[in-house]
Amino acid sequence: MRILEKAPAKINLSLDVHGKRPDGYHEVEMVMTTIDLADRLELTELDKDEIRVSSHNRFVPDDQRNLAYQAAKLLKTRFGIQKGVSIVITKTIPVAAGLAGGSSDAAAALRGLNRLWKLNLTLDELAELGAEIGSDVSFCVHGGTALATGRGEKLKHIATPPHCWVILAKPVIGVSTAEVYRQYDASKVEHPNVERMIEAIEAKDYKEMCGSLGNVLESVTLKMYPEVDMIKRQMKRFGADAVLMSGSGPTVFGLIQYESKVQRIYNGLRGFCDQVYAVRMIGEQNALD
């Protein structure tokens, strides 16, 4: 039997980080939404009791470092599954980009294996399991648009944002999330108004949504990696309505309301960055098929 699953990327429309918890994680408050840039997973049952992960992308690990591998191992262990599986990942989401590509692959593996192995788990149950793999996996199991709190695993689903285009640009650098968090000081940054963002989304107010974008990690990453700031400035210069770094970076996204502007901004950014994408904001929970 073969199962196909879609694994969409996400962006943070608002990202606030508070104090460090006793377990070493930070308390976060984030508004996240899915976009139609997605990996594809093909899951096939094997006769041999083993987990095989493969991808055409050489930067994707094929062992226990891979979050999709961890998802399969978790389900096998938790439910006593004595079957093997092959997981083939076709990557479209850039690796280590702040777009939750690995987390979304893990979430897709959980959903796909739930069907393949007929576990009959609900999405909420899969999301609970996903939290054991990574902070973003719970959100990625559901997709859509949500307020995430705790370390990212506590979700409150909210309305779909106003429809718009999203331009993404990833510079050819890697960002150490651990180092960004190490240098982050909650007392020295301007914190976004997360509630204002939620209200703008609920009201389908595009202008207010653009004005409410915020990411407390941005100032830290911009100091460490000037290339990210350059992309932000270029994206604004080419006409994006609002611009923000996603997650801990290095990917920058811009929101564009009208399709007529998208190609011009895309073409302009291609002169500065190889990895540029023009996609739509999905933001709906039923958009994973």
UniProtKB/Swiss-Prot annotation:
GO terms for molecular function: 4-(cytidine 5'-diphospho)-2-C-methyl-D-erythritol kinase activity; ATP binding. Belongs to the GHMP kinase family. IspE subfamily. Pathway: Isoprenoid biosynthesis; isopentenyl diphosphate biosynthesis via DXP pathway; isopentenyl diphosphate from 1-deoxy-D-xylulose 5-phosphate: step 3/6. The active site is at K10, D136. This is 4-diphosphocytidyl-2-C-methyl-D-erythritol kinase. Its EC number is 2.7.1.148. ATP binds at P94, V95, A96, A97, G98, L99, A100, G101, G102, S103, S104. Keywords: ATP-binding, Isoprene biosynthesis, Kinase, Nucleotide-binding, Transferase. SUPFAM superfamilies: GHMP Kinase, C-terminal domain, Ribosomal protein S5 domain 2-like.
